[in-house]
Regions:
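Aromatic-rich peripheral "rim/lid" segments of glycoside hydrolase catalytic domains that contact
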Residues: 117, 123-125, 162-167, 172, ...
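Noncatalytic carbohydrate-binding groove/subsite architecture in carbohydrate-active enzymes
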Residues: 46, 50, 135-164, 182-303, ...
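Bacterial N-terminal signal peptides
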Residues: 12-23
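Bacterial N-terminal signal peptides that target proteins for export
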Residues: 1-13
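Substrate-binding cleft and catalytic face of glycoside hydrolase catalytic domains
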Residues: 55-220, 238-241
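Flexible loop residues that form catalytic
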Residues: 5, 65, 171, 212, ...
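Boundary/entry segment of secreted carbohydrate-active catalytic domains
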Residues: 29-59, 63-65
């Protein structure tokens, strides 16, 4: 069992005061703008960011590709160009960025003995040398995008909206994203190394667990049910000192089923004595079109489920310590193909050509956007 963790909201509130001290009138005067977010699945353009701004999107969850930004073992050879663009466009419109850091470079995977060349993304760092590379990269990322970071000094005309919360990995309970198979002990080491690196630069930064999908592979091994993974993670001594937030990805055909998943997360957290930890619902969504799938609910069904979910989580925001809810996804990406996720290509609030869907109208009822 663990003791209740101290809250670290104060510094975050101060950091966001200038840009995010707008509140959502339609959701009640106490709801911060950052509560309502979206996650990206398609490349984002200026037009995407402009539309997000008018829709009053508060948080943008996006991926920082470690493999893309750190392509070789040469010290300091970071390529921040794509992340710079995304962070800058978001900041210019007052949108808070919540990054999840994922995708192991081939040279780092090789340190752990993996021969995967260009398919190493999900081979999370495990050994001392690979974890040292992980720490170095996160240190550099916070130095660039955190408070007073290099990106802000290089772009003085961009409103400073530093990244204060960092999500470490993605769906680590699934073999799709954590190879060769999910490993609680291995993830705990990744988490501890990440926490050490990030807080050494920004001691008020918040660390969010990688989002966890309820039942990878339909509950079959080597996938681990999210609540079981979380419970085993809590069994690691001192682990609650390494993170501040838990991130469900409660995908289900019906919202009632998604809610049951969130409740199971909360049960595990409370049982571990960590009921004060925040919930960041970093992915939640349904599709409006595409191939037959339980999560394809059609245009109106998608909008109805968004309304149902956002209404509930808004109501329970304080009771459940919910920091934000990010809809997956912002824009359709039919070119991605069905792949591992048959419904994802049409999960956007807007179509591929940025035409509003009914679900965007539902979203803006909560944000007072247009």
């Amino acid at each position: 069992m663990t003791v209740a963790r101290p809250r670290r909201w104060g510094a975050v509130v101060v950091a966001l005061a200038c840009s995010l001290l707008s509140f959502v009138a339609g959701a009640g005067a106490s709801t911060p703008k950052a509560f309502f977010g979206v996650a990206s699945q398609a490349p984002l353009s200026d037009a995407d960011f402009d539309r997000m701004a008018t829709a009053q999107v508060g948080t943008l969850r996006l991926e920082i590709f470690w493999s893309g930004a750190d392509p070789s073992a040469a010290p300091g050879d970071y390529d921040w160009s794509r992340t710079d663009e995304l962070v800058g466009e978001a900041a210019a419109r007052g949108i808070q960025v919540l990054p999840f850091v994922f995708s192991t470079p081939g040279w780092v995977a090789a340190l752990d003995g993996h021969e995967c060349a260009d398919t190493c993304a999900a081979y999370a760092p495990r050994g001392p040398a690979a974890l040292a590379a992980w720490r170095d990269f996160l240190d550099a990322a916070v130095e660039r995008y955190g408070p007073g970071g290099e990106f802000w000094s290089l772009n003085p005309l961009t409103p400073e909206l530093p990244i204060r919360a960092w999500q470490l990995w993605n769906e680590q309970n699934s073999p799709t994203f954590y190879k060769p198979k999910p490993d609680v002990r291995g993830y705990a080491k990744l988490l501890a190394a990440g926490h050490e690196a990030i807080t050494a630069v920004d001691d008020q930064a918040e660390i969010v667990l990688g989002g966890m999908f309820g039942t990878p592979l339909g509950g079959r091994k080597p996938g681990i049910a999210a609540w079981n993974f979380l419970g085993k993670l809590y069994d690691r001594r001192g682990i609650t000192k390494r993170f501040d937030g838990v991130a469900p990805h409660p995908y289900a055909a019906r919202f009632s089923e998604a809610l049951l998943q969130v409740e199971r997360f909360r049960e595990v957290m409370v049982e571990a004595g960590d009921g004060d930890a925040d919930l960041w619902i970093t992915e939640l969504g349904w599709a409006s079109a595409g191939v037959p799938d339980p999560l394809n609910r059609g245009p109106q069904g998608q909008a109805d489920r968004l309304t149902q979910a956002f209404k509930y989580f808004l109501k329970k925001r304080t009771q459940l310590n919910i920091r934000s809810v990010s809809w997956y996804s912002w824009r359709d990406n039919p070119d991605s193909g069905a792949g591992l996720c048959t419904w994802c290509p049409y999960s956007g609030l807007v179509t591929a050509d940025l035409t509003d869907k009914r679900s965007l109208k539902a979203f803006t009822r909560f944000t007072d956007g247009s």
